[in-house]
């Protein structure tokens, strides 16, 4: 099975800064990662969007 692309969006400003490959099987929760946002200029939580 091929992976689908998903974006990681900043929870503070909403910009989609990162893209990741996720499996196509549905999951009950979405991925949350602490990453650097170049627009906020700080580390924030980024949530998976589709």
Swiss-Prot record:
GO cellular component: cytoplasm; ribonucleoprotein complex; ribosome
Pfam family, one: Ribosomal_L33
The entry's keywords: Ribonucleoprotein, Ribosomal protein
SUPFAM superfamilies: Zn-binding ribosomal proteins
Matches recorded under Gene3D superfamilies: Ribosomal protein L33
Disulfide bonds: none
One of the record's GO molecular function terms: structural constituent of ribosome
Transmembrane regions: none
Lineage top rank: taxon: Bacteria
GO terms classed as biological process: translation
Range of residues in the leader sequence: none
HAMAP family the UniProt entry points to: Ribosomal_bL33
Family statement: Belongs to the bacterial ribosomal protein bL33 family.
Name of the protein described by the UniProt record: Large ribosomal subunit protein bL33B
